[in-house]
Amino acid sequence: MSGNTLGTLFCVTNFGESHGPAIGCVIDGCPPGMELSEADIQADLDRRRPGTSRHVTQRNEPDAVEILSGVYEGKTTGTPIALLIRNTDQRSKDYGNIAQSFRPGHADYAYWHKYGLRDPRGGGRSSARLTAPTVAAGAVAKKWLAEKYGTRFRACMTQLGELPIPFENWEHVPHNPFFAPVADVQAYEDYMDALRKSGDSCGARIRVQATSVPVGLGEPLYDKLDADIAHVMMGLNAVKGVEIGAGFASVAQRGTTHGDSLTPTGFASNNAGGVLGGISTGQDIEVSLAIKPTSSIISPRESIDIHGQSTEVITKGRHDPCVGIRAAPIAEALLALVIMDHALRHRAQCGDVVQAVAPIPAVRLG
Amino acid sequence: MSGNTLGTLFCVTNFGESHGPAIGCVIDGCPPGMELSEADIQADLDRRRPGTSRHVTQRNEPDAVEILSGVYEGKTTGTPIALLIRNTDQRSKDYGNIAQSFRPGHADYAYWHKYGLRDPRGGGRSSARLTAPTVAAGAVAKKWLAEKYGTRFRACMTQLGELPIPFENWEHVPHNPFFAPVADVQAYEDYMDALRKSGDSCGARIRVQATSVPVGLGEPLYDKLDADIAHVMMGLNAVKGVEIGAGFASVAQRGTTHGDSLTPTGFASNNAGGVLGGISTGQDIEVSLAIKPTSSIISPRESIDIHGQSTEVITKGRHDPCVGIRAAPIAEALLALVIMDHALRHRAQCGDVVQAVAPIPAVRLG
Amino acid sequence: MSGNTLGTLFCVTNFGESHGPAIGCVIDGCPPGMELSEADIQADLDRRRPGTSRHVTQRNEPDAVEILSGVYEGKTTGTPIALLIRNTDQRSKDYGNIAQSFRPGHADYAYWHKYGLRDPRGGGRSSARLTAPTVAAGAVAKKWLAEKYGTRFRACMTQLGELPIPFENWEHVPHNPFFAPVADVQAYEDYMDALRKSGDSCGARIRVQATSVPVGLGEPLYDKLDADIAHVMMGLNAVKGVEIGAGFASVAQRGTTHGDSLTPTGFASNNAGGVLGGISTGQDIEVSLAIKPTSSIISPRESIDIHGQSTEVITKGRHDPCVGIRAAPIAEALLALVIMDHALRHRAQCGDVVQAVAPIPAVRLG
Amino acid sequence: MSGNTLGTLFCVTNFGESHGPAIGCVIDGCPPGMELSEADIQADLDRRRPGTSRHVTQRNEPDAVEILSGVYEGKTTGTPIALLIRNTDQRSKDYGNIAQSFRPGHADYAYWHKYGLRDPRGGGRSSARLTAPTVAAGAVAKKWLAEKYGTRFRACMTQLGELPIPFENWEHVPHNPFFAPVADVQAYEDYMDALRKSGDSCGARIRVQATSVPVGLGEPLYDKLDADIAHVMMGLNAVKGVEIGAGFASVAQRGTTHGDSLTPTGFASNNAGGVLGGISTGQDIEVSLAIKPTSSIISPRESIDIHGQSTEVITKGRHDPCVGIRAAPIAEALLALVIMDHALRHRAQCGDVVQAVAPIPAVRLG
């Protein structure tokens, strides 16, 4: 398996390149009988779409999704759901100047060595554009989980470059271009404007959360729920770190502090991030991601060409100066796909899953 | 699949419980013709073994491995290698008092809800004892990778509780009970003695490294090398965070800093941690883990019993006050299993892999 | 996994319905660097295409394939190859009269019970139309195997209803509408004309052969080469029996007859059909299939409706009176996909495969 | 994957060699809470065991199974069930004379070419002895299916060499050494005695049946129920042909005959063998197998040695002159494993399965 399929029971097979004719995916294993239309999927695609603010790539892609199969008379049939998104705004000429050399921090060096060739148009297969089909598939998973268990997914930015973003309220997230949980984002607007002007890029930290997750999801020994979450999150372009619950802070915690006390009305804290022994506890799943700065920048960088000779690389074209900005809806989709897969795996072995244990106290990280 | 198999081509299927008659694994997909004996495996098992210092559990297990199949006249045959380790020092009575209640931070709550029952003897299947077969399988992978590519694995502790451990030299690691890369470990001895006396536990941070890794390993889109590394590492008992290369520090880096420059003699830095676009670059693979404090502690904790009633839990028995101490050889094994699997996947699709790109400059993290 | 992906390393994920907007597949795992164009695939699709003689369905589908991804500058890149075939000649109204009842011998009864709904348009997902993407994927496998090992695939009809078709020569196969290895097909033309007039359908027997197959392909214990061949062949619509080599005739053979003698110049016979112990021997792979008569016939049949009430069913629409007629190119494709997958599996574990053992004597079945 | 794991959700990983220290398997995915003991498994192992009549190999193996894991207080826990069978009656010296040459019709030629070596002791991994762990795993599946759905499995011999065995009654099967459904087996006793005396071997035909199979099992497109049945059956040692329902007889049937009429009280016939469109219909599953004559015979055969030189081979040692005789319980186990896997797959995607449609008329093949 060449790694383009995600999931064991709710399987998403992704295809396409940034500058090819189309991208898309095939979802295999969706339960039959769920109402599904393009509109259900388009909403999340629009949240991820480029060109929506001056802080992201100006490539203009409507990312309109077409359902090719698996839905009959408005309902899923249980057969593969093929989703197609045509590429419409490729400008391959922008990439001509980097076809013979390698961008520092970019996948093109590794692709060249692995396959003996590479598609330099927009990064080809390594482009973050390929997260669009993942988001589309995630929308299907979200809908099923919401209808079946009331599970919800949300994500926000908690740090932009060196600026921490305090958590005020989830309500602010949809109202600013940064997916920031704060009312006033002027500081981040200014930061990004200065960054763009400098020709550089920056990293970001993203928090992802799932609520009303059924208890009992996750397969020990190796396919633990948190292991599979780490897999999808680290596999997202530019991610260099993943935390569950207290994450790296747990290193300096004592056992008497870290272990979340249980009470007759629920857990007293959530250092576990909703997972114990690799299995969901019914608490909120809490994940945090470190996203590195974009490698495609206009500032000149020292590098080599395909013949191993020293050269200088400048990446023109339309790139996100902070890929973390658009990562929130993608991270939600990835978390939904993992939970969906484990929901099906659970009912295969253990029968239908139990609803989230109630009441779960509102103790949350950050 | 219930999650007890790791890998797609070099497949390890793990079985057993902490206090059952035996634990073990079946390795399927090992190339034929490699010399292999129990001694090749025992060395790593001995590094992970309990009872080797006063800072780890005093359970006395020789962890002697028996090869049941897959080796003929001292060589692997290409058929499944079954490895068996008999349990010899179970004391199930130690666990009687916790069979009816849940330990805060422990898997038993989740197992109970998932399966409708649990094996309370030593945590049953959720016990860290089940890492022994993983270490055994990892030893087989290490041997093949060393012979074929010269790949080497090592790990050390970089933080114990709130005490950071500076990096002095890899040579110190085998000479102290903490896998610490320092000459003088008195501070850590004292720290652990005080911790044990207090009846509490602490976390740790572990660094894992692979050198001479062939370039080109890793399968985009979803089964990237770093994604699969994150999967196995987060799946290790008690791990709450995983970083590749610069990890969470990359959030505050600029693109001009983070992206490792390429020069005719190699990369100028290793913020990437040896992976670009999910594919190995030939640089050292660098991984860092956050390990939470042990949940099984002697200090009384607030909890509930299986009927949902309030209770107090004290965990007697023999437990590691810092599970991170024995994590180093396990983390090495997990990294070896991932790289082995991707080496086979690579040669399936692309033919035999290229040796590590040379020369690789000695730039390393930390 | 819902069963729409074939193969473990050369993976084909099939999607679409007979009367939806499109059908297609995603091939994951194709080695990089092979020249590939739509023309390479179209040739086999044209051999399978409906409407090419009066003996097959008169549905007029050009089955024009579009490569959506995985090919750059005329060469495979090692990333997923998505193939799209638009449906152009659906006439859903033809099926209105059977939406409320079940055709004897047809999948619609089983689909109804499995999914709680069904797509009655042309059989939806159960239609033989879904073999088109399989044929397209098989063409890619055939090309790689031919270039790498010189492996070739061919199939012919050996029985039509109760009429055995003697084997004269492979050269005749492309020159008649039955894929029959004989020069004179008048008897079969007459037979089919009479059958159509009677409103009935008939079965067929198909022989499939691969030549110049490398020795050593196949994974014991469970994924033997012949086991995987039986899997794909029995999974082909309407197939009720599969034989390898001597097949059912071997029941009455003695060991002294059945076991193919080995001589310094090759095997003396091929009762094994090219497989011993589940592993290819370098001899020709020989497979035989039993294909049942089409269930969609115009003759009235006793049946029940979806409420369990007695009814009579007549299937109008455009159907193949003998689905076996178009089965030859599909069976070739299926055999190619199995051998391709095992070629990649073999080189993953054992390194690159050995060429077919030469000389292979020309002893062939029937 | 090297092919030693069967199933996608109820996964059986098989290990061991005929003359190694032990054979066994790991079952992953068994639902928790089912009562299980060694006795539940031993019964089927005893039916398959060698040495039970003069017509089978005289190797004396008790085949005593030990449960190493996955069962706690007499119930399955949902974690891997490891089963171990020690080999006790190996006589490796019997095989010394064939280590340097290849037996016609035997796997050793293919193993040699695949792996570059082979284990000549009793055929090593290719030995029919490795069906014992499969039978053990099948016993677990049978128990779960019987308790959950009332599904039952049985198999009998329908032809021995050139002697057809008429079907009288299933009740006779356990009362003769041939698993023959007839009261008087004198003819078969005589046939086998003469065969043994002649130093030759013969084939057999086996019928396998599952009753009370839930409707809706099977995953189109590729993992159809009949496809997966064909996979396991063709993968059984010595099998050269597989039929479902009417099998090869369907070639000469007309559609008006083959398609089983539906009536308000059930199907009027069972040419389909219980599967339509790859999905179970609730009718009995009917399978037929062709088993070739044993290749290990005492009569001298023309062959080559490992240097390609002409030689003569005589196989001493203890072999079954008709491996089909012990195939009945193995075929039952294989069918049970496939149905078990699909039962779990079905409830993953579609929720819990429906009971077998009743009443199913008693129309049965042959």
Swiss-Prot record, chains A, B, C, D:
The protein's Enzyme Commission number: 4.2.3.5
**Cofactor field:** FMNH2
Looking up CDD domains in the UniProt record yields: Chorismate_synthase
Binding-site positions, FMN: 125-127, 237-238, 277, 292-296, 318
Q: Mind listing the GO biological process terms from this record?
A: amino acid biosynthetic process; aromatic amino acid family biosynthetic process; chorismate biosynthetic process
How is the co-factor bound, per the entry? Reduced FMN (FMNH(2)).
| Catalytic reactions on record | 5-O-(1-carboxyvinyl)-3-phosphoshikimate = chorismate + phosphate
Q: In which pathway does it act?
A: Metabolic intermediate biosynthesis; chorismate biosynthesis; chorismate from D-erythrose 4-phosphate and phosphoenolpyruvate: step 7/7
Kindly indicate whether the keyword Amino-acid biosynthesis belongs to this entry: yes
Q: Where is the signal peptide?
A: none
Q: Does the keyword Flavoprotein apply?
A: yes
- Please name the top-level EC class of this enzyme: lyase
Q: Which domain of life is it from?
A: Bacteria
Binding locations of NADP(+): 48, 54
Q: Name one GO molecular function term.
A: FMN binding
What's one Pfam family the UniProt record gives for this protein?
Answer: Chorismate_synt
Any single GO CC term annotated in Swiss-Prot or TrEMBL for this entry: cytosol
Q: Which UniProt keywords apply?
A: Amino-acid biosynthesis, Aromatic amino acid biosynthesis, FAD, Flavoprotein, FMN, Lyase, NADP
Q: Which family does it belong to?
A: Belongs to the chorismate synthase family.
Question: So what does this one do?
Answer: This reaction introduces a second double bond into the aromatic ring system.
- Mind telling me which PANTHER family this protein's record contains? CHORISMATE SYNTHASE (PTHR21085:SF0)
Q: How does it assemble?
A: Homotetramer.
Protein name in UniProt:
Chorismate synthase
Organism, by scientific name, is: Acidovorax ebreus (strain TPSY) (Diaphorobacter sp. (strain TPSY))
